[in-house]
């Protein structure tokens, strides 16, 4: 969970109102291999240890709340998997609450937009704050599937990566077709609040 000012997300409407936002990670068991959408906040910010990893400024701004047993490797264990079972990691974008544990998955194929990789490893000055390079600096030699737009991951329409740039230069969302549930749209940070969907663009 992150806690921060709603005004950041609604072009300063309701500024000063502090909301809690879940840090979502998704485990998708597909016949072609186990897939993750986002890896959440780094394990190092767990149990009140944020400042030693993110620094005081980021911790004060985002106020993360995370127990060690809420990190993605522990969630995988709860469902009977290990980090080595993961075949694909689709990362919505490289911000600190979405790409924090990429380095846990050296055996996976990492699916990202080319523009996002460039923005994360060589960020512009005004974009640097939410990219934590040490989250993924040791992942430079991982196996990347670098995209330039939408992509049908398995070629059957069951998992489609959608280019939803805006929040970052290479933000991507995921459309997943489930047999019993139907089609789900995993938006990442493309839509935060009902106001965004109604036309109030994210701040």
How would you name each of these model-derived features?
Residues 2, 43, 94-96, 117-118, ...:
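Solvent-exposed loop/turn segments at secondary-structure junctions
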Residues 37, 92, 112-113, 166, ...:
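Active-site flanking residues adjacent to catalytic metal/cofactor-binding acidic residues
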Residues 42, 62-97, 104, 113-165, ...:
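Metallo-beta-lactamase
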Residues 2-74, 173-190:
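Conserved beta-strand hairpin/beta-sheet module of binuclear metal-dependent hydrolase folds
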Residues 100-106:
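Metal-dependent catalytic neighborhoods of phosphoester/phosphodiester hydrolases
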Residues 8, 47-50, 122-125, 196-200:
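Short aromatic-enriched loop/helix-cap "lid" or pocket-rim segments at secondary-structure transitions
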